[in-house]
């Protein structure tokens, strides 16, 4: 059973922006931290992945910017939460939360996210979430573009092989057949696309706290992020 986000109003919301490259642990760490503080977790990358998947399902070449842009008004994309509080993505009413995690969709997401009109199309939606909720929002341009006035900005990173290993293990757990070499190759290509795109390239905000998660356990990384949030907001995790 799905439930729509319940909006709050009339109070100043707290926003935590977490950016970083693919495989740095953004989603897992952000989700865990949000749960501990009772905040809404927003995985913006899932939205771009959903657009990439929509293009694939419609037979649209994501390198054809005009075709992708023309498709946007036709899409019905919903970010909702299930009874366990997990973020789920619906595309035209269908749950695509698993489909958007496939490696090929990751590359499509990187390409559609490089289209300026796509990013502009999604900016208001993402900012609205932060205006109406206490959020931990992760992505690649949250601290630099989406939430430039976030209460706290964190830039997560790790070595390419560490990130590829995490992504590889994550895919195996989800039953996706792949190889470590393939995941590493895709990750390096994704890094290149994300850092070199003209529209909102991946980079740390000038006032972001840099956090290298190389060699860290999940618990260590979550603990460090929670410490930073507590120091900045005065709120203690539950």
What does each of the following model-derived ranges do?
Residues 21:
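P-loop (Walker A) phosphate-binding loop of NTP-binding proteins
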Residues 36-101:
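N-terminal phosphate/diphosphate-binding loop that engages ATP/GTP or pyrophosphate donors
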Residues 29:
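Hydrophobic positions on the alpha1 helix immediately C-terminal to the Walker A/P-loop
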